Amino acid sequence: MIQLPPHHLPAEPRWFAPGAPGPAALPEHVTATGVGSWWADRALDPRAVAVSCAGHVLLSGDPGSVAPGLLAPFAHSHVEAPVRFLPVLGSAFDRVVPDERMVYIHREPVEPPRPPRGVTVRRLTPTDAPALAALSADSSWIYDSWGGPEGLAASEHGWAAVDRDGRVAAVACGYFTGQAYEDVAVLTTPERRRERLALACVTALCADITARAHGELVLRTREPPEPPAGLDGGLPA
């Protein structure tokens, strides 16, 4: 598929239903943040479109208009698409691996765990960008959907457990943010695991999301993406 320039984007509601949970919030997130890309089978009057961000892809439209070779940019990605796209996905890649995720429906308040001495759980601010950038390379995925550590730090959609020296021990954030739902990512550094820091960050983030959404909260916790050689996709992605 061809990547569309910012001034020639398709009308989002026509292709993707707004207000859906999980990665379905991706189009709203890309539109609002400018992080990610829109794709189409052709620039004028597209018959199929895709939106991608941080290794995740949503497909919509007529799969018959998509030659397998047009999907090459989405190799090694997590793909969510209607079932009708499975034949062309199977033709485009050596391996298509279905991926299922647990969806948590948050309805009851949860008492936040008390962090250990010397650790503060708080909202990220722009001054936290260097601490996020200092995370290991294996942890860099946590800010990919915001375009980098500076984007996540300034987003007002992230909470972190920070020690006295300003190091980030755990972080939870809205990975894909929509008007009705946010897809949540959470990360704890290896040396600070089993201290309930991730739970403390997620609890604070969920309270923040609920205060903004004023309604039911549906969350997906996500692990670092590890797609196989080929395409990692299926329903759901």
UniProtKB/Swiss-Prot annotation:
<dbReference type="InterPro" id="IPR016181">
    <property type="entry name" value="Acyl_CoA_acyltransferase"/>
</dbReference>
<keyword id="KW-0808">Transferase</keyword>
<protein>
    <recommendedName>
        <fullName>Uncharacterized N-acetyltransferase in mutA 5'region</fullName>
        <ecNumber>2.3.1.-</ecNumber>
    </recommendedName>
</protein>
<dbReference type="GO" id="GO:0016747">
    <property type="term" value="F:acyltransferase activity, transferring groups other than amino-acyl groups"/>
</dbReference>
<keyword id="KW-0012">Acyltransferase</keyword>
<feature type="domain" description="N-acetyltransferase">
    <location>
        <begin position="119"/>
        <end position="237"/>
    </location>
</feature>
<dbReference type="InterPro" id="IPR000182">
    <property type="entry name" value="GNAT_dom"/>
</dbReference>
